[in-house]
C-alpha cells in the first residue's frame, strides 16, 4: 500500500479493491434469488499480454462470485469460425456477458466481430448501439477504461467541473467515450481531444488541468508538456526492454512518470493504476448485464 509519501498517487490497487468489494457484496445479495452472473471470454491466438489480461479478468471474476469460461481459439481461426462462436454465445441464455479480447489477428476484422456481439451482452460497451446510447446520455454499458477513469476521479474527490481536460488519443475504446463522459452535465469539463495530427501538442497539454494520456507510446508525455499541479491519468501500458529484470522488460505508461510526478497534483502509476480500474468496472458491467437479462426474461 502507498505510504504518506505517495499521497499524490491515484492508487488503482486500493480503489479497484473497493469496487470489487462492493460488487462482491451486490452479487452475494443477488444470488439469494438468482444464479451467479456468467461471463464468456473469447481469446484468439497467444498474445502474451492478452493472455495475461484474460487471466486477470478470470481471477477478478472468481473473487467477486462471477462465473466465467474462456474460449481460447488458435491464431489461425477464421473470421467466420469466430463469428459462429459469437453467435452461439449470443443465443446461449446462460451467458450474461461476452468479452472478445482485443487485439484480434490481422486477418480478422475487429469491427465486424464487435458488431456481431449481442448489444445486451456487450459488457465491453464497444457495440455501436452501446456507444450510441452513451453519446445520447442513456448508457447501458460504459466502456470499462473510461468508466474506470471516471470512477477513479470520483472516489478520489477530484471534480472535473470547469477543468480544462485534454485527452491524448481518440480511440473508440478510450478517447472518444471518455470525452463524452467528461462533457456530461454530471462532469462539466471543457474537453479537448488530441491525436497524431494535432499541431503543437504540447501547447494543448500544458494548459490541461486534467491530462489523460492514451496514445500507446512509452513515456510520450514528458514534464515539459505538463502544467504545474495537473491531474495526470496514464492509460498507456507499454513494454520496454530492461535486461536488469528477470523478464527482460518492464511496463511503463505513456507518461514519463518520474519526470512528471513532481509537477502533478495527482498521478496514476503504471502498473497499478488505470488497468486495475478497467478490470473492476468490467465486473460492474457484467453484474448489470445479469440484472438486465433477469428483468427482461
From Swiss-Prot:
Molecular function GO labels: methenyltetrahydrofolate cyclohydrolase activity; methylenetetrahydrofolate dehydrogenase (NADP+) activity
GO cellular component labels: cytosol
GO biological process: L-histidine biosynthetic process; methionine biosynthetic process; purine nucleotide biosynthetic process; tetrahydrofolate interconversion
Pathway of action: One-carbon metabolism; tetrahydrofolate interconversion
Reactions it catalyzes: (6R)-5,10-methylene-5,6,7,8-tetrahydrofolate + NADP(+) = (6R)-5,10-methenyltetrahydrofolate + NADPH; (6R)-5,10-methenyltetrahydrofolate + H2O = (6R)-10-formyltetrahydrofolate + H(+)
Claim: Membrane is one of the keywords in the record: no
Binding, NADP(+): 169-171, 196, 237
Enzyme nomenclature, EC number: 1.5.1.5, 3.5.4.9
InterPro entries cross-referenced by the UniProt entry: Aminoacid_DH-like_N_sf, NAD(P)-bd_dom_sf, THF_DH/CycHdrlase, THF_DH/CycHdrlase_cat_dom, THF_DH/CycHdrlase_CS, THF_DH/CycHdrlase_NAD-bd_dom
Keywords: Amino-acid biosynthesis, Histidine biosynthesis, Hydrolase, Methionine biosynthesis, Multifunctional enzyme, NADP, One-carbon metabolism, Oxidoreductase, Purine biosynthesis
Family of this protein: Belongs to the tetrahydrofolate dehydrogenase/cyclohydrolase family.
Chain's role: Catalyzes the oxidation of 5,10-methylenetetrahydrofolate to 5,10-methenyltetrahydrofolate and then the hydrolysis of 5,10-methenyltetrahydrofolate to 10-formyltetrahydrofolate.
UniProt subunit comment: Homodimer.
PANTHER family attached to this UniProt entry: C-1-TETRAHYDROFOLATE SYNTHASE, CYTOPLASMIC, C-1-TETRAHYDROFOLATE SYNTHASE, CYTOPLASMIC-RELATED
Protein's recorded name: Bifunctional protein FolD
Organism field: Salinibacter ruber (strain DSM 13855 / M31)
